[in-house]
Regions:
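Conserved active-site alpha-helix within GNAT-family acetyltransferase domains
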Residues: 96, 108, 120-139, 143
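Conserved acetyl-CoA-binding loop-helix of GNAT-fold acetyltransferases
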Residues: 85, 91-104, 131
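Conserved GNAT acetyl-CoA-binding A-motif
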Residues: 106-118
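A conserved beta-turn-beta hairpin within the catalytic core of GNAT-like acetyltransferases
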Residues: 69-80, 90, 136-137
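Residue-level recognition of the GNAT/N-acetyltransferase active site
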Residues: 86, 119
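Terminal substrate-recognition subdomain of acyl/acetyltransferases
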Residues: 2-3, 104-107, 134-135, 139-154
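Acetyl-CoA-dependent GNAT
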Residues: 2-75, 99-101, 144-146
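Short acidic/polar active-site loop segments enriched in Thr and Asp
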Residues: 49, 112, 135
Length: 154
């Protein structure tokens, strides 16, 4: 019988480095563990937290990166930047466990909403979110400012 995962916030460069291979499954553009640790430090300075689901040996099985925010649309809310479970652990309940953990953090932090974005190319993630009580409320639009800067410079 499998033991339930241990949920722990990762706060040090060593812990972030250990979590890098899991995050890279979600964010393949991330190049290396050292750069990832530096990125985590910068994001932590902007109130980002990284929560890990770990097995009894301490191996990272999944991650939820989030931050508490406030805006005129949602009031105080918890925004999930990153939610990933290793390919081998998907459909094991770890993703739902991570979502429950951040939902509890949102409740304790007096948030009115839990918010996240997912790509239109990720139908399995969308189905997971629907099954776990999240509803699609809008679309996310992006414009690369790097492209605009390059075109303006030419």
């Amino acid at each position: 019988m499998n033991m339930p995962p241990d949920f722990k916030h990762l706060d040090s460069p060593d812990e972030w480095t250990q979590a890098f291979p899991v995050m890279q499954e979600l964010r393949p553009h991330l190049q290396d563990a050292a750069s990832f640790a530096r990125q985590m430090r910068r994001q932590r300075d902007e109130h980002y937290r990284l929560l890990a689901a770990r097995d009894a040996s301490g191996a990272v099985l999944g991650l939820a990166g989030y931050r508490l925010q406030m805006n005129t649309l949602y009031g105080r809310f918890l925004y999930v930047d990153d939610l990933i479970v290793t390919a081998r652990q998907q459909r094991s309940g770890i993703g739902a466990g991570l979502l429950d953990q951040v939902r509890d953090i949102a409740h304790r932090s007096d948030c009115a909403h839990l918010v996240l974005d997912t790509g239109l190319h990720m139908p399995f993630a969308q189905r997971f979110y629907f099954r776990n009580g999240l509803l699609a409320k809008g679309m996310h639009f992006v414009e690369s400012l790097q492209t605009i800067r390059k075109e303006a410079a030419q």
